[in-house]
Amino acid sequence: LVAFQGRALGESKLRYITVKIDRDNHKLYGIDRINTEETIYVTEGPIDSMFLENAVATADSNLMAASRHFDKSKIVLVYDNEPRNKDIVKQMEKAIDEHYQIVIWPEMIVEKDINDMVLNGFSPDEIQDIISRFTFVNLRAKMEFINWKKV
């Protein structure tokens, strides 16, 4: 057992809780399904990763930890859509500064994460298309990020 995670089903402010047995041991949910020759999507939540092709989850906001397992040039970081969350904003800014490919969610997406998008009627194919169109790197990522963040 590496970790376990629970999700609130109601309107709780605390939506997820993750308990890791060894906090220094970075494991990825879904690593056994990854094709390293293809683009690898890295999400925060295991549930989110199940709706994307070739995706893993970190079970926290440290998505860059996936680069310990995969070629950085193959990775796309898919953070939750939380422009007011200081931790997420800080992690995203660091990822941009370190030249990762990163998804900057468009304004039309009001949902917090991929799971919420599915619950609100988006198909996995629609989500994959949005992610493909709104993946940026370097200066373009920085420009999109400045417009996206709210802190």
Question: Can you annotate each of these PLM segments?
Answer:
Residues 1-74, 87-89:
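Phosphate-handling DNA/RNA-contact segment within nucleic-acid enzymes
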Residues 42, 70, 74-79, 89-151:
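Replication-associated primase and helicase/ATPase modules
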